[in-house]
A protein has these predicted regions:
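PLP-dependent amino-acid enzyme catalytic core
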Residues: 1-363
């Protein structure tokens, strides 16, 4: 019987979902969200914290600080609670409310950036804030997931070898690009593997990672407003860009079959399907990495008002048409109707963002 004493010791990462019956393409989805942090970011967080401890950078007086759109923040909040560190996560207004509350429940503080940098976007503004905090107080320790080699080494040592073991005949691997830690770790591993693997990076339209123009992005996770320092394009064979509307459709298509995945996973799956529709063959062996699960996206990706306000009422039409209950339930028209009279009732979450108090030097 497995017994653990720290939360990061549990990580079920050898589960795959066969998506052939859902998307009509030969694709296996590697699920990375079955741990107490809920995402693949647990691996990078653990690697970076342990390296900082070995190097003597982290001490009992240290205060961890990191810029995160959500998932790494949760992983660091969990590890900080387990190891007795204080942690300040610097995120922005796109971060899901449930994610912010989860970090707070784990004892961490959250600062929300509400104004994007004109050039670097929200990420640039978050990094500026982190740098200012570090300059103001020497107790702050910034692991810097955007430059820390521990980010990609975690996947060189764990994620990629696991895929190679489970799929010795792998032909193509689809990996989402955020900080590019997962992407670079896997790409470096398979560059040295015994057979060629076509590594496809999946990014969001509006991200500048691969040189595209910056544009509005509302789903946290993949994509970046600043080119990641870890990225080395020489290891990558191809890049697929995904519109956020297609991310939403992929998420809902999976949900209609009982699989609730996060926005990053929806982007990767949509990109993989697009590529396989064009290049796939019946004998191809393809794997995509699912970074996260969907519970933290219930107020955004899976919330009707949020979807329609940002992407229009018809964004999910192709998905709804394919759903067996698409015509069975009428859409609610009166949010205040009496639920006892058979009318569906919906509620709209509060969209106000209230920054939390910040730690001050000497406190």
């Amino acid at each position: 019987v497995p017994v653990i004493s720290v939360p990061q010791a549990f990580n079920e990462d050898d589960l795959y979902v066969d998506l052939a019956s859902i998307f009509d393409v030969p694709l296996y989805l590697k699920c990375e969200g079955f741990n107490f942090a809920g995402s693949i970011k647990l691996k990078a967080a653990t690697e970076m914290v342990e390296a900082a401890e070995r190097d003597g950078v982290l001490t009992r007086d240290s205060v961890l600080i990191e810029s995160s759109s959500g998932n790494l923040g949760v992983a660091l909040a969990m590890i900080a609670a387990s190891r007795g560190y204080r942690f300040l996560c610097v995120t922005d207004s796109r971060c899901n409310l449930s994610t912010r509350r989860l970090m707070e429940a784990l004892g961490s503080q959250v600062h929300i950036i509400t104004e994007a940098d004109p050039v670097g976007g929200f990420l640039g503004a978050r990094i500026d804030y982190v740098e200012a905090m570090c300059a103001s107080d020497s107790r702050f320790v910034w692991l810097n997931q955007y430059r820390n080699p521990g980010n990609w080494r975690a996947h060189l040592k764990r994620t990629a070898p696991a895929i190679a073991r489970d799929f010795p005949g792998l032909d193509v691997l689809f990996v989402g690009a955020g900080t590019t830690g997962t992407l670079m770790g896997c790409a470096r591993f398979f560059r040295e593997w015994h057979r060629p693997v076509h590594v496809v990076a999946v990014d969001a339209v509006g991200s500048v990672t691969f040189g595209g123009p910056q544009a509005r992005r509302m789903i946290p996770g993949l994509g970046s407003g600043v080119r990641p320092a870890l990225l080395d394009e020489s290891y990558i064979d191809e890049v697929v860009l995904v519109e956020e509307a297609d991310t939403l459709r992929a998420c809902h298509r999976l949900a209609h079959r009982g699989f609730l995945f996060g926005g990053s996973t929806g982007t990767v799956v949509s990109g993989a399907k697009s590529w396989l529709d064009r290049h796939g063959s019946p004998g191809i062996t393809a794997v995509a990495i699912a970074p996260d699960l969907g519970e933290r996206y219930l107020d955004t990706v899976y919330q009707t008002n949020w979807l329609e306000d940002l992407f229009g009422k018809d964004v999910l039409d192709p998905v709804q048409a394919a759903h067996p209950f698409s015509e069975s339930l009428s859409r609610p028209t009166d949010a205040g109707a009496d639920p006892g009279r058979g009318t569906l009732v919906t509620s709209r979450p509060d969209a106000d963002v209230v920054p939390l108090p910040l730690p001050r030097s000497g406190n």
